Amino acid sequence: MRGFLMFTSGPFDIDFVVLWVDGSDEKWLQKRAIYSSTKQQNNAVRFRDYGIFKYWFRAVAKYAPWVHHVYLVTDEQIPNWLSIQNSKVSVIDHKSIMPEDALPTFNSSAIELNIANIPGLSEHFVYFNDDMFLNRQVTPMDFFSEDGLPKDSAVQNAIMPVEDFDHMTANNVMLINQNFNKYQVLRRHPFRFFNFRYGFLNVLSICLLPWPRFTRFQDPHVPISFRKSVFEKVLNLHRDAWNETSHNRFRNRNDNTIWLIRYYQLVTAQFNPRTPFVGKKYNIGEMKKIVNDINTGKHKMICINDQNVSMAEFDNLTKQLRSTFRSKLPQKSEFEK
C-alpha cells in the first residue's frame, strides 16, 4: 500500500469526471432557446463560461498525475485546445449516457445522475463541476481510503430554504428518511458521524440530535468521491425519481441531485471520515480571497461559484481569474494541443 500513499495510481484505478458547457456557443444557445421559457432564459448565469477550463486540466496534470482517466461530459462541444488524441481523456456526449427521449437536456442534475453510464468508467471515480479546481498536490488518499471507500464528512445540517434548489435538497433528504432510521444509523456508526476530523462542525450534529429524522447534511462544494456500484444501486432503488429527473430538461423543484448518492454513502457508512476543510467554496465576487488562495495553495481544492453580477463586472472578475491562473499554471499540459 505504500504506493497508494505516494503519487502513484494506487491499488485501484481512480477516474475523474467533469461536466462542462460553453454557454457562449451560438449553436448551443439556439438549441436552448427552442426549449426554454422566459424564466429559464433569465437563468443563463448558470451557463456562463469563465474561460479558464484549460487550467482545470493543467491542475489535474500537475497536482494529480496519478489519475487513471479523465471523462469530460459535454453537449456536442469540445474545447478547441483539448487534445482528444490523448489516451488519458475521453469526451463523452450526453447521447452516450442519457435516455434518448430526454435530449437535449440543460439540467445539470439530470446529467449528473447518469454519469455512471459513462462507458469504461472505473469503479472508483471523483466527480467535479467545472468550477471546482485542484489547488495543490493531492494523492489518492485525499479521495479514497486504502480499502476503496470514498473519503467524505458526515456533518449534519439543516435546510434553510432561499431558492428553488433547496427543494431538491429536501427531495434527497426525504428519500433517505423514507429508507433509514436516523437513530439506528447513528448508533451503528457513531464515529462516522461524530469525528475529530470534523472539528467544531461536530456541534451542528450534536445540536440536531433531538430531531428524530435527518434534516440535511452539510454539502461542501468540493469534488465528490463515488463508487460506481453504489451509484448504480441507489438509482435502481429510486428508479422513478431517477427517471423523472432525467427527463426534466431544465432544473425542476421535483429533481433529485447527485447528493442523493452521496447521502446514501454516508448513512450506510460506505465512506471514511475526512476533514470538511479540505476545500473552500468562494463566490466569484470574492476575488481577493480567491486570488490569495490560488497563489498560496491554502486549500487543496477550491470552488469558484458564479453569482448574479452584471456582465461588465463578470468580465472584469474573469479577466482577473484568467490572469491569476495563467501565472500559477503557465505551462501547457498533456491534455492540450
Curated annotation (Swiss-Prot):
Asked if the record carries the keyword Transferase, the reply is yes
Keywords of the record: Exopolysaccharide synthesis, Transferase
Q: Name one GO biological process term.
A: polysaccharide biosynthetic process
Pfam families per record: Stealth_CR1, Stealth_CR2, Stealth_CR3
**EC number, as in UniProt:** 2.7.-.-
Q: Report a single Gene Ontology molecular function.
A: transferase activity, transferring phosphorus-containing groups
Q: Does the keyword Transferase apply?
A: yes
Q: Which InterPro entries match?
A: Stealth, Stealth_CR1, Stealth_CR2, Stealth_CR3
Any further remark recorded for this protein: Stealth proteins are part of a protein family that is conserved from bacteria to higher eukaryotes. Family members were first identified in microbes as proteins that help pathogens to elude the host innate immune system. Microbial stealth proteins are involved in the biosynthesis of exopolysaccharides. Stealth proteins are predicted to function as hexose-1-phosphoryltransferases.
Please state which protein family the record places this protein in.
Belongs to the stealth family.
* Name this protein carries in UniProt: Exopolysaccharide phosphotransferase cps2G
Task: Report the source organism.
Answer: Lactiplantibacillus plantarum (strain ATCC BAA-793 / NCIMB 8826 / WCFS1) (Lactobacillus plantarum)
